[in-house]
Amino acid sequence: MAEMDVSSWKPTKLETKPFSLDSGHYTALAFVLAVCVPQAPHGTALRYGLLLLQITCGVQAFLAQPPSVPDRAVLYTSGVLMGNLVARYFDRLYTTVPEKTFHRIIDSQTPEDTTQLSAPKRFFWALELFSVTRGIGWNWRVAGIPKSPVPITRFQFAAAQLLRWTVMYAGLHLVNVTCQVVSSNPNAIPSLPGNLHIYALIVCGFAITIYSHFAILMLPLSALCVGLQVGPRSWQAVASWPPNFGSVREAYSIRRFWGYTWHQQLRRQAGAPGAYLISLLPDSVMTSKRTAVKLARRYSLLMMSFVISGLIHACGTYQVTRALGLPLSDGGEMKYFALQGMAIIAEDFGCWVLGIDDRGTQPGVMRRWMGYAITLSWYIWSRVQLKGVPVALAMGIEDERGDLFAALELVRVSAVAVPGNFVAMAWELIW
């Protein structure tokens, strides 16, 4: 056995890469600090220091390098989350004293006194405050939330939620497979019927994907909390888990589509900046009964809500473009959401001219079906041409056969990116 010359041996220096925080780390830090801010007494130096540090982390999330993730859909979702949380902080932290403003409802009449909570309970109160989106069980429950399911046992509810969870994943896998089939012909040049088919696939695919972004956690969590009676007390009731989306039957106008049928996850934080700005107006304007002033307040709030929603979604495209070294872009998000608000204003004006008033009355058959046709046509066209196509192109997705195929590919990668699809895994094993 050869002898080793110990005197000539030198230790090998391990190469280490310097650790640096990316935007995902700063997003998480900003959230943790937001939960910590209400733990410090209001008006103290500690409170202001925590708040300043929280704001710094929130801003740094938009400036630091994005996570090293090549998946466009994941990057987009992380960017939307960043924008969503900033809007949430503006509403529940920056413009108010949260422990004095936001209270959980103990029963139908009694709000919880947050100032009397112990330190551990106040921490979990703050964690819930910055986590919930629709204010269910709080004194700020948003309007338009769909009614809770008909009375059923908690085990029936849990089973139904898990079934929806499975169907959701099956729908995502179906979107992926269908998009692959439609895109499999490299020479396809869609005719008008083909266009309609692709439009429908894009809109339905996006709808299922958006639904999954909320349901992926809410469905199993609700089944766990209600079925096993675990978690916060308010989460253990079936009534605490109403559907994310309302009935399609309500979508006989563009206003009702966005107000009742579509999800309400962003409604509170999207409307908060506009409500705050309106509150700064003189009392004479705030309380004026003049029709012109009331209409100006109403439609200003409407437009500002859609603009903020556009900004939140634009953060997603911003995150993708800077991560992949593409030209910075909002992907048309601002235009798309602003035009939704303008469409509602135009619709209201048209109803006023025609003498149509849907408030408090059930529409007639003609009104309902004409409304369905107009709303569906507007939504499908705008969802594809004003959002799907521009976002896909901004993300660097191109197809020589046309922009519709680029949007279709965006739908496919978005559906595939949703984690934990056990239905797709089982399908691959079987087939």
UniProtKB/Swiss-Prot annotation:
GO terms for biological process: terpenoid biosynthetic process. Glycans are attached at residue 176. The lineage of its organism: Eukaryota, Fungi, Dikarya, Ascomycota, Pezizomycotina. The macrophorins cluster contains a single gene insertion (encoding for the terpene cyclase macJ) compared with the yanuthone cluster that produces the linear compound yanuthone. It is found in: Membrane. This is O-Mevalon transferase macI. It comes from the Eukaryota. Its main location: membrane. Pathway: Secondary metabolite biosynthesis; terpenoid biosynthesis. The chain crosses the membrane at residues 198-218, 301-321, 336-356, 404-424. Keywords: Glycoprotein, Membrane, Transferase, Transmembrane, Transmembrane helix.
